[in-house]
Amino acid sequence: MSGQSLTDRITAAQHSVTGSAVSKTVCKATTHEIMGPKKKHLDYLIQCTNEMNVNIPQLADSLFERTTNSSWVVVFKSLITTHHLMVYGNERFIQYLASRNTLFNLSNFLDKSGLQGYDMSTFIRRYSRYLNEKAVSYRQVAFDFTKVKRGADGVMRTMNTEKLLKTVPIIQNQMDALLDFNVNSNELTNGVINAAFMLLFKDAIRLFAAYNEGIINLLEKYFDMKKNQCKEGLDIYKKFLTRMTRISEFLKVAEQVGIDRGDIPDLSQAPSSLLDALEQHLASLEGKKIKDSTAASRATTLSNAVSSLASTGLSLTKVDEREKQAALEEEQARLKALKEQRLKELAKKPHTSLTTAASPVSTSAGGIMTAPAIDIFSTPSSSNSTSKLPNDLLDLQQPTFHPSVHAMSAAPQVASTWGDAVDDAIPSLNPFLTKSSGDVHLPISSDVSTFTTRTPTHEMFVGFSPSPVTQPHPSAGLNVDFESVFGNKSTNVAVDSGGGLLKPTVASQNQSLPVAKLPPNKLVSDDLDSSLANLVGNLGIGNGTTKNDVSCSQPGEKKLTGGSNWQPKVAPTTAWSAATMAPPVMAYPATTPTGMIGYGIPPQMGSVPVMTQPTLIYSQPVMRPPNPFGPVPGAQIQFM
């Protein structure tokens, strides 16, 4: 990071913020450091070209944008990165470059920041011209000459005459652009131009190998060509000899800068007699006078030239194969180094990794062993079922989760419907809160066995035990069962199945609900006079009302009030949204005072308002009993 400029860091940070990893890597590969692009950045960009979800035009545009920089270092490194991707990247990259009309418009580039900028600007212009020519060549022949198959069955050796005469000049133009780089060993003074020279050196070897195979194919077909084709072929061969001389000079520069001698191919010159034979054959086709030459001599000369060029091609192929082998060995060495580094890291911290890996398992195992899971929907065990048999007289087919449901819903509703007369005499601080059922003082059975024999299902709501339900205390002197008079005595509460603790149950669809127990405002109390007065008032004695005085104030749809259709009315949650109450089936006595309506709601037209306890200011609406002929709770007695 020390060689990077502040501009490079800001640009990389901007791409990091925008989330463009490709643009950030392009910026990192083309910094102002006077050195070649780093291998890690080039490898990342190569991998990006192989990914189908990477936008190749965006990658190329990022590189083109970097070439507009005024610094020769940034521009040169941008060209090197582009060249590297064209050679080693996916073919989609060079296909996109070939589809563009123009690539690099750097023919007038000049960096005037220093003397080195002037010198490097010259090579930048030459280098950009070669890259443009490389893309144009791909556009014309639809393949890269540096990547074509070589050998006896290669692309250039099996090409027909017409196509061969059109393809070889394209290779010549690309070779001319490469050799025009024309750098000396004294000018390779920095890492940037050295990186560009290495890429050009590898391209020169591969390109000349394809060029050499094209010439071999041309010579083999030369004596069978027409006159015009022979003329074109002779011109191509003369240019080939010139470029062979230039490529030899280029390879000498590579040897001078320190490239291994084994990586430089040996170029074998064709015999000069071959050129004379080609010229004589063309002259004979044109009708000129030539010295006599036999077909055998021409065949010998041609075979010698082809063998010389074939040896050159073999040398070029060996160099290419050696380069591939070196690349494979380098990758294997890197992989081996990574494995050794990984083994060292594991050897340093063996206990820590094992401990951290085993800790969660051991902790969870210990938790499982110490805290067994409770299945709230499982059936009771055999021991619990045996101990529950004496108390399970009426609930033989009762589901195990019924007590839990009643513990949440039914018990608090019954216990808090009327409240206690003594406790409710004092107004609550918050009239909108339901009075807690815990304030009701009830005698609780001392039978502890009922709790010890409870199944785990009963304990599914730990800490939320059901509120006790008030039982009416029968009078010592009077034991009157008024419910049995009308034949609707409930049998569901005849047996105490809870051992002293009431155990509410959920009624099914085909089972009638039991008569609701009266809250602490009891019909029958310890005082005989008050009990008789309440009973007489409920029966309507002395007010002249008979059973035939039943009136229906609304001609609408009748709704049954008893049986499975009965639903308790819950107090409204707010003072302005009162619950709609259905009109009673039987009219109340005219002398019965209505009291105050709960929460100050006016009575409905054509119906009797809900009766509430007169002494309460904020009380809840009364639950309508299922028996229309039963006692009406909350009515007061007036003696006529």
Swiss-Prot record:
Domain ENTH, chain residue ranges per copy: 14-145
Annotated localization: Cell membrane; Membrane, Clathrin-coated pit; Golgi apparatus; Cytoplasmic vesicle, Clathrin-coated vesicle
Keyword Ubl conjugation among UniProt keywords: yes
MF (Gene Ontology): 1-phosphatidylinositol binding; clathrin binding; clathrin heavy chain binding; identical protein binding; low-density lipoprotein particle receptor binding; phosphatidylinositol-4,5-bisphosphate binding; SH3 domain binding; small GTPase binding
InterPro entries in UniProt: ANTH_dom, ANTH_dom_sf, AP180-like, ENTH, ENTH_VHS
Cross-link (Glycyl lysine isopeptide (Lys-Gly) (interchain with G-Cter in SUMO2)): K238
Chain spans, region Disordered: 543-568
GO BP terms in the entry: amyloid-beta clearance by transcytosis; axonogenesis; clathrin coat assembly; clathrin-dependent endocytosis; dendrite morphogenesis; endocytosis; endosomal transport; hemopoiesis
Region annotated Interaction with PIMREG, chain positions: 221-294
Compositionally biased region (Polar residues): 544-554
Keywords in alphabetical order: Acetylation, Cell membrane, Coated pit, Cytoplasmic vesicle, Endocytosis, Golgi apparatus, Isopeptide bond, Membrane, Nucleus, Phosphoprotein, Ubl conjugation
Expression (tissue specificity): Isoform 2 was found in most tissues examined. Isoform 1 has an overlapping expression pattern but is absent from lung, heart and pancreas. Both isoforms are widely expressed in the brain, higher levels are seen in hippocampus, dentate gyrus, medial habenula nucleus and cerebellar granule cells.
Modified residues (N-acetylserine): S2
A GO cellular component entry from the record: early endosome
Similarity remark: Belongs to the PICALM/SNAP91 family.
Self-association and partners: Binds to clathrin; involves primarily the C-terminal sequences, but the full-length protein is required for full binding capacity. Binds phosphatidylinositol 4,5- bisphosphate. Interacts with PIMREG; this interaction may change the subcellular location into the nucleus. Interacts with AP2A1 (via its alpha-appendage domain). Interacts (via N-terminus) with VAMP2; VAMP3; VAMP7 and VAMP8 (Via N-terminus). Interacts with LC3/MAP1LC3A.
Function comment: Cytoplasmic adapter protein that plays a critical role in clathrin-mediated endocytosis which is important in processes such as internalization of cell receptors, synaptic transmission or removal of apoptotic cells. Recruits AP-2 and attaches clathrin triskelions to the cytoplasmic side of plasma membrane leading to clathrin-coated vesicles (CCVs) assembly. Furthermore, regulates clathrin-coated vesicle size and maturation by directly sensing and driving membrane curvature.
Protein name: Phosphatidylinositol-binding clathrin assembly protein
Species this protein is from: Rattus norvegicus (Rat)
Name of the encoding gene: Picalm
